[in-house]
A protein has these predicted regions:
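Radical SAM enzyme [4Fe-4S]-AdoMet core and its adjacent flexible, acidic
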Residues: 1-107, 111-121
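Flexible mid-to-C-terminal extensions adjoining Fe-S/redox cofactors in radical SAM and related proteins
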Residues: 106, 110-177
Length: 177
């Protein structure tokens, strides 16, 4: 795994250009998130020319097998050149997946640390949590975000928890109607 952020993207670009991921069978790129020990300063911006260069190189090279986490998918969609859209698995938070913490709180995404979208499984079933108004509100933010965007069906609305990590520079990004 390779965490891709402001502090690592130059190295990632250089390694792809120079084919210097020695004896590596496959690389999974995980987008840096400003959670836990993650710093806001390491969040990549879609306007950074290195972001476009990284995705163009990544999708042009055939020397490595690679994968990306679902948070990185908007970057692939917006900057990648040669990939199969069906190979991408975008964010499914609250739609097809959820996270259950050790204290039995269910949230749409493991990066939701605010408590705003949590449902207590000591008082509710998983089905009740999934069908709850709390989860509906979360899903609707994604469902109605980015109106008119031609890539909405592939990106599914980016990230409502941390919009700053969405590698998209379209004016429709995260706008909710």
């Amino acid at each position: 795994h390779y965490v891709l952020g402001n502090n690592t993207i130059n190295e990632a670009i250089d390694r792809i250009k120079q084919h210097t991921f020695p004896r590596v069978n496959a690389i999974i790129f995980l987008l840096h998130k400003p959670q836990g020990l993650g710093k806001q300063a390491n969040v990549l911006k879609p306007s950074d020319p290195r972001v476009q260069e990284f995705f163009e190189l990544l999708t042009a090279e055939s020397y490595y097998r690679f994968g990306v986490d679902s948070c990185t998918v908007p970057g692939m969609i917006n900057f990648g050149k040669n990939y199969d859209i069906n190979s991408l698995d975008t964010c499914e938070a609250g739609r097809f997946s959820a996270y259950i913490s050790a204290d039995m709180k269910m949230v749409p995404c493991s990066f939701d640390t605010t408590g705003k979208h949590e449902v207590d499984l000591r008082r509710h079933t998983i089905q009740e949590a999934y069908d709850s108004e709390t989860f509906d509100v979360f899903r609707n933010k994604l469902k109605f975000s980015c109106p008119g965007c031609k890539n909405k069906a592939d990106c599914l609305g980016g990230c409502s928890l941390m919009p700053e990590i969405v590698l998209c520079n379209r004016v429709t990004k995260n706008k909710v109607i």
